[in-house]
């Protein structure tokens, strides 16, 4: 469905283009060469981005699905309040299990000192988690765009509704001259 996604100016991407497919089940960078010719350049080797967000939301007691809840809370928080580990995976593959573990262990330690830590910091936790996920996603996508000399970049999947990711796409468009294609929600 990402091939039919319309960009900010109601145009479709020209082949070849990149698509970041990001959901609860997938995190992939796809090189779309034609309607029936696609190549997965990178994908998750463990948890998908959306799955990690959902699990972190559950650990915080926020419910499922966690994506919309984290997105809403993140808008009110400081994305630099907390730092979580980012994977150092070579190539264009993704890994989110380490982030999930880092988040869980950090919460466990903070709750020892303050049993109400999550309640006192949930907007900053959400914003910091979202910022980390977006940084991981965009770092690999940026590398793929540079490596394959691609300027048309699309995003698809449930996590494409996330405001932090959508804003990062817009920032990358301005900074790197990308033509972006973001689904309308």
Model-derived segments and spans:
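Glycine-rich phosphate-binding/hydrolytic loop that grips phosphoryl groups
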Residues: 1-2, 183-185
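Short beta-strand scaffold segments in enzyme catalytic cores
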Residues: 19, 27-31
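Conserved phosphate-binding catalytic cores of ATP/NTP-utilizing and phosphoryl-transfer enzymes
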Residues: 1-17
